[in-house]
From Swiss-Prot:
Pfam family, one: Ribosomal_L30
Superkingdom of origin: Eukaryota
Lineage: Eukaryota, Metazoa, Chordata, Craniata, Vertebrata
Name of the protein in its database record: Large ribosomal subunit protein uL30m
Transit peptide: 1-34
Source organism (scientific name): Homo sapiens
GO cellular component: mitochondrial inner membrane; mitochondrial large ribosomal subunit; mitochondrion
Quaternary structure annotation from Swiss-Prot or TrEMBL: Component of the mitochondrial large ribosomal subunit (mt-LSU). Mature mammalian 55S mitochondrial ribosomes consist of a small (28S) and a large (39S) subunit. The 28S small subunit contains a 12S ribosomal RNA (12S mt-rRNA) and 30 different proteins. The 39S large subunit contains a 16S rRNA (16S mt-rRNA), a copy of mitochondrial valine transfer RNA (mt-tRNA(Val)), which plays an integral structural role, and 52 different proteins.
Length: 161
């Protein structure tokens, strides 16, 4: 570049314009990584509407307590803050369900990565299992948590005759 500028200074003024046009074509900015910026999406987009409840099901008066969250898309070529949230939610491995509470702090994180995940409500047809029954539970692909009850052996009473 210094050699080109030295030639420009030595040349007559008429040739200066043709050389500067050639220098502009040499400068290419395609290799520069442009900075990611957060999208400025208005908050009203994230507010629930009655049409959403009709479309996706659910009752706004009695919301479910737990979410089943599954990552369905890759985090490659995604911004760093989306990768951080995926790691916070424990969704590094794809198609592995994670259970999260339905609270505002968790929901705010889920909104940021909602295009990468699938969210289903956790249905408890037999109610919330006790601590001793947690090892006997099975999570179905439909989103139901089924408690597998084990039969206890009946004690035989001795008959005296």
């Amino acid at each position: 570049m210094a050699g080109i500028l030295r030639l420009v200074v030595q040349w007559p003024p008429g040739r200066l314009q043709t050389v500067t046009k050639g220098v502009e074509s040499l400068i290419c900015t395609d290799w520069i990584r442009h900075k990611f910026t957060r999208s400025r999406i208005p908050e009203k987009v994230f507010q629930a509407s009655p049409e959403d409840h009709e479309k996706y099901g659910g009752d706004p008066q009695n919301p479910h307590k737990l979410h089943i969250v599954t990552r369905i898309k890759s985090t490659r070529r995604r911004p760093y803050w989306e990768k951080d949230i995926i790691k916070m939610l424990g969704l590094e491995k794809a198609h592995t369900p994670q259970v999260h509470k339905n609270i505002p702090s968790v929901n705010a994180k889920l909104k940021v990565v909602k295009h990468l995940i699938r969210i289903k409500p956790l249905k408890l047809p037999q109610g919330l299992p006790a601590e001793e029954n947690m090892s006997n539970t099975c999570l179905k692909s439909t989103g139901e948590l089924v408690v597998q009850w084990h039969l206890k052996p009946v004690e035989q009473k001795a008959h005296e005759s």
